[in-house]
């Protein structure tokens, strides 16, 4: 690779110097072995050219991982798989609800609740014996799009209107926490604002906060979206999403869903094998 700095183009159109450590980190975080990571990094850096896009780099890394460590490739593609839950955003709400279920909460989606002044439609309501959480699930289906200060302010105002109301979820109670969950990033001003709001605005982005981000939660819970699978095509995934099915593990627990797609037994076996390898 040329010793001169090489600039790559990010998904938002901005240019930055290629950082080999970012590529290494993303591969290792997905679970790639040191040997595979070193091999992929070497292959990509040898072919790197000025102006190459992050999408090009990701695609090549995914192809190499798919060959060397297929289950790792599925984890590496996680961010894009979440984006494929769209475009409506409703499957993302279901997906966020599944994360809360894993954490021991009961959940409902698409709830209309009465605030002090107006009614609000809440994407996810989650509760257990200890707390009641209401969630705004902000879905973006394009890389490079961030949730900005305007979104954070809007969501905080909604939670403020709900803060003194009594709700019946499990028992009569008031709202304990308001969450803003997005599948991409927050702008720096949104993060600065949110950092001063306490439990009134808990902000969860793809890689924010440093510990406990959406990506961390997904890996901890092993709740891989069915959109990460390579053994199903786009039409088949869309059919399942329209039925409210968002998780790989649901397809193993309910094999009749795959039968309902009209898949032959050989394909069903391949899908199941791919899921179990995750």
Segments predicted by a language model, with ranges:
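Long, C-terminal-biased catalytic regions of enzyme "large/alpha" subunits
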Residues: 1-85, 92
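N-terminal alpha-helical segment
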Residues: 19, 37-40, 174, 222, ...
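Residues that form generic nucleotide/phosphate-binding pockets
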Residues: 26, 47, 64, 158, ...
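Short linear loop/turn motifs
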Residues: 40-44, 115, 207-210, 253-257, ...
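Compact, charge-rich alpha-helical regulatory domains located at protein termini
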Residues: 216-278
């Amino acid at each position: 690779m040329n010793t001169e700095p090489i600039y790559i183009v990010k998904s938002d159109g901005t240019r930055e110097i290629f950082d080999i450590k970012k590529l290494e980190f993303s591969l290792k975080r997905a679970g790639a072995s040191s040997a595979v990571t070193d091999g992929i990094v070497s292959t990509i850096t040898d072919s790197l050219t000025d102006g190459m896009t992050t999408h090009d780099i990701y695609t090549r890394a995914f192809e190499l991982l798919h060959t060397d460590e297929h289950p790792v490739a599925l984890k590496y593609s996680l961010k894009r798989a979440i984006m494929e839950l769209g475009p409506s955003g409703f499957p993302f709400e279901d997906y966020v609800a599944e994360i809360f279920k894993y954490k021991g909460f009961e959940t409902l989606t698409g709830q209309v609740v009465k605030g002090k002044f107006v009614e609000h439609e809440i994407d996810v309501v989650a509760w257990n014996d200890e707390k009641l959480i209401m969630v705004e699930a902000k879905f973006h289906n394009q890389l490079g799009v961030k949730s900005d200060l305007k979104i954070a302010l809007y969501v905080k105002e909604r939670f403020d209107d709900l803060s003194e109301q009594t709700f019946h979820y499990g028992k009569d109670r008031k709202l304990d926490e308001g969450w803003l969950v997005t599948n991409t990033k927050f702008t720096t001003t949104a993060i600065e604002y949110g950092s001063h709001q306490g439990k009134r605005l808990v902000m969860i982005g793809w890689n924010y906060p440093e510990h406990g981000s959406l990506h961390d939660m997904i890996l901890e819970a092993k709740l891989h979206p069915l959109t990460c699978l390579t053994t199903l095509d786009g039409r088949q995934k869309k059919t399942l999403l329209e039925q409210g099915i968002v998780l790989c593990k649901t397809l193993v627990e309910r094999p009749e869903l795959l039968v309902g797609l009209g898949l032959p037994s050989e394909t069903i076996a391949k899908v199941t094998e791919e899921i179990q390898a995750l």
